[in-house]
Regions:
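Short beta-strand "wing" residues that participate in macromolecule-binding interfaces
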Residues: 69-70
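Amphipathic alpha-helical dimerization/coiled-coil segments
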Residues: 31, 89-121
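DNA major-groove recognition helices of helix-turn-helix
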Residues: 62
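Residues within the DNA-recognition helix of helix-turn-helix
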Residues: 58
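Long, low-complexity, charged/polar intrinsically disordered regions in eukaryotic proteins
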Residues: 1-4
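Glycine-centered, phosphate/nucleic-acid-interacting loop/turn motifs that mediate DNA/RNA or nucleotide
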Residues: 66
């Protein structure tokens, strides 16, 4: 059984989802993976609805798990950039597969479900 810190997991899939799961982490990973290094404000603008505090927390957790790298530059005003680590980049094929699965699911299931509701079924 895998363990992360003090937490035990039933399997590696559960551990993976605990690291990248949540409303905002995958979106942040997606932008960093597809668009490259971003400053905090750029990431926040790409994620409408996220609060500054939530983005800070999500990025810190990803940094703690060595998925995201945070680079602080000694300039005024402060400049901080975020990028994927090598370990973080290994998640991109998984995120790509999840994206494709979601597109297919929406196209086949949700569209059919909406049509059935319109037809009274």
């Amino acid at each position: 059984m895998p363990k992360l810190g003090e937490k035990d997991f039933n399997c590696e899939k559960e551990l993976t989802l605990s690291i990248i799961g949540g409303k905002w982490k995958m979106l942040a990973l997606w932008h960093l993976g597809k668009e490259g290094t971003k400053r905090f404000g750029e990431l926040k603008n790409l994620m409408p609805g996220i609060t500054q505090r939530m983005l800070v927390n999500q990025l810190r957790e990803l940094e703690d798990h060595l998925i995201v790298h945070r680079e602080v530059y000694p300039v005024v005003p402060p400049k901080v950039e975020y990028s994927l680590t090598e370990q973080g980049r290994t998640l991109m094929p998984i995120l790509d597969a999840m994206y494709e699965w979601g597109k297919t699911y929406v196209a086949t299931n949700l569209q059919n479900h909406d049509e059935e509701e319109q037809n009274g079924n």
